[in-house]
Regions:
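SAM-dependent Rossmann-like transferase core, predominantly class I methyltransferases
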Residues: 168-248, 253-261
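Conserved SAM/SAH cofactor-binding pocket of Class I
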Residues: 222, 230-315, 321
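Conserved Class I SAM-dependent methyltransferase catalytic core
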Residues: 274-275, 336-389
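Flexible, glycine-/basic-rich loop-and-beta segments that form/coincide
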Residues: 395-473
Length: 588
């Protein structure tokens, strides 16, 4: 199978040609946004493909069998006591992200991301009772398999005793979903020489998300479902800064994906959730992935950690703006976007100096109010911020999205209409016209003049973006330290991923316009004039900005003083957006 084909599939370590993003973390080539299961815009309902797009709801359970009855584990959860032995068996059978791709092939693997399992069932049927095929049927397709076949694939006695499997006569079935996963930092060592071959453990039928098709059937009353890996969670993992840190907090951990990533570069990891079952699933995810244990605390928002501070805080919170807290995994129990606001406002007090907090969120677009101002007002004192809106939905689209997620579109038409009305009543009462989706990153700086960038970027991006986030704040530091005069004394390098495009009539002496375009990261594009294009093209770090402008002034026969006076703003923009990188003086 070609590496290019692999790039369109979720949860696979293989990279596209040219060092593309790991699949499932989001990336090129589709136009970018929060919630797809595919890493490159390949999700059937997501034109953007980084997991944050509004049209890719949590309610698209990957791998839940067609016609699945929505059964969720009702027995006590498995014990992690022999997780290392089970992990060894799974890896020996090739039950990894890449192994799945090799077994199923690209079409069947991609179909799982669309909740279509027939192609995968056919593929495993052809593999007979091979251990990998048996494990796929057990843990991904959630089929009962003959005891003898399971015995050949894994230590079935241990799996039964510890509660991973349940025996039914001469067959066994899985009690939880176990999903191979390889994320943005999957090249990290898991401690056993297997690199980033990880496993995320969640409730059956909930590998990616949503209550649609679950509806509480097969669950004890009051049992809260715990979802597995979804587009939103892989997006957050992809934008998280890749820094070695002393302490990390995964707030609202769910099945533990962010805690698993944090464990690769944090000395100490704390994970919290209001749902005690989620913490048990996190324990299983960490153990089965060969990751260190985390501190697991029950409670809402920052309540469980008191006044503790961290170097890194991450959260994929229950941010859905809904008329009631029906589903804990998505509804935070606060009105409107108050949960996201509270999370952002309180995060600053829990960050160590230089620490980062990164969240996904929703925010209301309220009549008579600029949404930029709304979310900017959330930023706590002492923090820089970068807030990126990736998508917007009007209130009808938003309501329909989450009604489908909850499976309400399968309910009685009158009940569906009643619930739809409740959503619209809620939005009308709050004067909400639409809802934005996006990313929020804070950095604790205690600067006198904080940098707060709030922007809309609904276009294609290439994950992972953690390094891009770090570079953004480094550039903000540079610009904060340099006024226009010192900017002209600086040295710059055209970023290696930037290309120049010229558009104009064939045969014309000059182009109508020139565009600088990034082919990696945020994939920004900006129109520049001939001076800007010439300036950027000459920036190789050997000449100061002022000397370059003086040379250009001679070429275009312009007063160098005038050119120096009007150009710093353009240089500042090119630096801020990552087209130019500040470098040290070539002579030190």
């Amino acid at each position: 199978m070609s590496r290019g084909a692999a790039a369109a599939l979720p949860y696979v370590r293989r990279r596209a040609p040219g060092g593309g993003s790991p699949c499932g973390a989001g990336g090129a080539p589709g136009p970018g946004g929060p919630r797809s299961g595919g890493g490159d815009g390949s999700h059937a309902t997501c034109p953007q493909g980084d997991g944050s797009h509004a049209k890719c709801p949590r309610g698209a359970p990957i791998g839940a069998p067609s016609g699945h009855n929505g059964r969720v584990s009702t027995t006590s959860l498995p014990s992690p006591d022999h997780a290392a032995e089970l992990r060894s068996a799974l890896l020996a059978a090739g039950f990894t992200a890449d192994g799945l791709l090799d077994l199923l092939g690209a079409p069947a693997y991609a179909a799982l991301a669309r909740s279509e399992t027939v192609p995968a069932l056919r593929a495993t049927r052809g593999a007979g009772d091979a251990p990998l095929a048996v494990l796929v049927r057990l843990f991904l397709l959630q089929q009962s398999v003959p005891y003898a076949h399971a015995e050949a694939a894994l230590p079935v006695g241990v799996a039964l005793a510890d509660g991973w499997l349940l025996r039914e006569g001469e067959s066994v079935r899985a009690t939880v979903d176990v999903r191979p996963y390889a994320g943005p930092d999957a090249d990290a060592d898991a401690g056993d020489g297997t690199g980033g071959d990880w496993f995320v453990v969640s409730d059956l039928g909930c590998a990616v998300g949503g209550a649609g098709g679950i509806g509480g059937r097969g669950r004890e009353p009051g049992t809260e479902v715990v979802l597995g890996v979804g587009g939103a969670s892989t997006t957050l993992a992809g934008i998280t800064v890749p820094l070695p840190v002393g302490s990390a907090l995964d707030l609202g951990t769910g099945s533990g994906l962010q805690a698993l990533h944090a464990a690769q570069h944090a000395t100490r990891v704390t994970a919290t959730d209001v749902n005690p079952r989620a913490l048990e699933f996190t324990r299983l995810t960490l153990a089965l992935s060969g990751a260190p244990d985390a501190e697991l605390l029950t409670g809402s928002l920052f309540d469980p950690v008191g006044d503790a501070t961290y170097d890194l805080i991450v959260s994929n919170p229950p941010f859905v703006i809904s008329p009631g807290a029906r589903l804990t995994y998505r509804d935070g129990g606060m009105g409107g976007d108050d949960l996201c606001r509270t999370l952002v406002q309180e995060a600053g007090a829990h960050l160590n100096p230089g620490g980062y907090a990164q969240f996904l969120g929703n925010w209301q677009h309220v009549e008579g109010e600029d949404w930029h101002d709304r979310v900017r007002s959330w930023v706590p004192r002492g923090c820089d911020a970068w807030i990126v809106q990736r998508d917007v939905q009007d209130v009808t689209q938003y309501a329909e999205l989450w009604l489908r997620d909850a499976g309400d579109h399968h309910s009685d038409p009158a009940e569906y209409a009643r619930r739809y009305e409740a959503w619209l009543d809620e939005f009308e009462a709050r004067k909400t016209r639409s809802v934005g989706f996006g990313w929020i990153t804070l950095r604790r700086t205690d600067a006198a003049e904080p940098s707060i960038v709030v922007e809309e970027w609904p276009h294609s991006v290439e994950q992972p973006l953690g390094g891009t986030v770090l570079a953004h704040f480094a550039r903000q530091d540079y610009l904060r330290r340099h006024d226009d005069a010192s900017l002209l004394e600086g040295y710059f390098l055209l970023a290696h991923e930037v290309v120049q495009e010229q558009v104009g009539t064939p045969g014309a002496e000059d182009p109508e316009h020139v565009v600088l375009r990034q082919n990696r990261g945020m994939r920004r594009a900006t129109k520049v004039d001939t001076v800007g294009a010439g300036f950027a093209g000459v920036c190789d770090g050997s000449l100061s900005a002022g000397r370059i402008l003086d040379a250009i002034a001679q070429l275009v026969q312009e007063d160098p003083v005038v050119l120096r006076d009007r150009t710093p703003e353009a240089i500042r923009m090119l630096v801020e957006q990552g087209f130019l990188e500040p470098v040290a003086h070539p002579e030190g």
